[in-house]
């Protein structure tokens, strides 16, 4: 019997089965058999019956192949797995057992919509009439009315999630910024993201030169002994041509951003960063009048991809990291020379496992980027890097930067910018709290990984940004969209 001890195990196992079958060339034959292999039955282990469990696996297989889980596909990277949804309560406010059925009936008096009725043992809220204003909860002297909402809806920073008539979550394509927080927060795993693992495997099997671009947020995510060299050795064993740190792209981005910031500052203009695709999506969808203020500098991922393709036009580039929005940058933004694919940690590990490759401890000897490029994975890292570059090049302007840490702070900063009330000159926006290290597909919680991450980065050499960039032909590719 398949034992699901966590939703993470289910996600990982589906990816592994798909990756293994893809390498073996048997996915067409195995596709319909994988659910039965994983869910043997006869007793269910995590849902009401084995048939629902198998359908959940079946829809996750479709996601693993880069398809929508159901028949309809709106093009969004983030998708609701309908067979796994609808088990959460929809009613936002509920009367709990704390209700004393008192004579005061303050809750009923506070409701302006007639949504609360007296009951035999406690008051009752009619969900059809309730407007979720919360006045009843505030009025109850016993705190007997609780605010209960779905984790997916709570986690969405742009109110892109609602429900259909059957209680299944619906993602509004026009509002969604692809941050992926809903997928991370759903305790039933009812929201997932499309993957490109079958595409990457097809290119590996075809003998193409596939390069991994590893996110700077990776250091610290897998323990103190797993270094960039560990990753480089592992992906090469799995068939990749080589691995390049995306932090190197951070150094490249820093140089270009510094030039943009200085020009804008001297012209009295405001700007926002462009390296976080979730933040960029937020601006374009919810503050479109500010879109022209987005830096034209490409992301570190794109910078490294362009560098690789300038050397080898036939190269295939694959970003690896904790970010869901990077998939959106690849699929939606269509930036020339950008990475061909983006994978999260579970997806690259599934590819490695299918090739019997594991991450192994290795000395921290491999380094492409400066320490400042490595800290691009943290909120505030872009600002620190740009200011360091200005210092190195003796361009010391009194530039003020708003470091917007997380979607809520991003919205606040953009609102001030929109109204002409932003006191700072620039906004560094990170849609995830903590920066990329807080991405929805992270392998470890920020607080647990922090010390390990800091120690790994401290062990790197202290090369300057300007010196590091001299190693590369920066004139062979453009740093702008």
Spell out what each predicted region is.
Residues 1-60, 64-66, 193-481:
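Iron-sulfur-associated redox domains of electron-transfer enzymes in respiratory
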Residues 70-96, 113-114:
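N-terminal [4Fe-4S]-dependent radical SAM core
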Residues 88-109, 138:
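Glycine-rich adenosyl-nucleotide cofactor-binding module
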Residues 98, 128, 215-217:
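Short strand-loop junctions, especially beta-strand C-caps/beta-turns
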Residues 102, 131, 147, 177, ...:
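Residue-level recognition of alpha-helix initiation/capping sites
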Residues 104-127, 131, 135-177, 181-197, ...:
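Iron-sulfur cluster-binding cysteine motifs and their immediate structural context
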